[in-house]
Amino acid sequence: RPRMSDWFITTIAAFICFYLVSRQPDLGTGLIVFVSGMIPVYLAGLPYRIILGYLVGLAMVTPYVWSNLLLEYQRQRVLTLLNPEADPLGTGWNINQSQTAIGSGGLTGKGYLSGTQSQLDFIPESHSDFIFSVIAEELGLIGILAMFILYGFIIWRIFRISYQSETNFERITCSSLGFIFLLFILINVLMVIGIIPVVGV
């Protein structure tokens, strides 16, 4: 079982990475990097009282971060999540176009490279951040289900390899990769359907 100093050092290292990335500024990616760095710490046996302490500390600093550290466009991303129709041609444009693309795909989609939202450049970063919207529009629900099945198979294989590993290091490393991969999938999907603010992943 790791010592308390090991958890502290790892947390500091993850926070330094978060700070450097967030200064770009890229707060979303910085948070993802921090969480990804903390996943192995949790899997190594981080006590629940420490996790609770992290959460309490996060709740305490959130008002200060919102008022003093977040840039205006970052605050607007959060506010847009609550009411994307308030500025449909400005801050709400990305999520509105994304939801339109997803909803218009239907069961089978409009066909490969035949999506109007994606091919006419209504969707920003359609090749990366909003690729889920493009797949939903062009391949429909069937394409999305096929994608989830493929993702599920990859994640299942990762955790199966972790289960078969002989050392704790191998198990923690493999399981961490599986959880980080799952984290990126969830963030991307939840972002494009409007459940969490838009971040680049």
Question: What residue spans do the PLM features occupy?
Answer:
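Long extracytoplasmic/lumenal interhelical loops at the membrane interface
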Residues: 106-142, 169
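Transmembrane alpha-helices of multi-pass inner-membrane enzymes
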Residues: 194-201
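Short loop/turn and capping residues at structural boundaries
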Residues: 52, 112-116, 147, 201
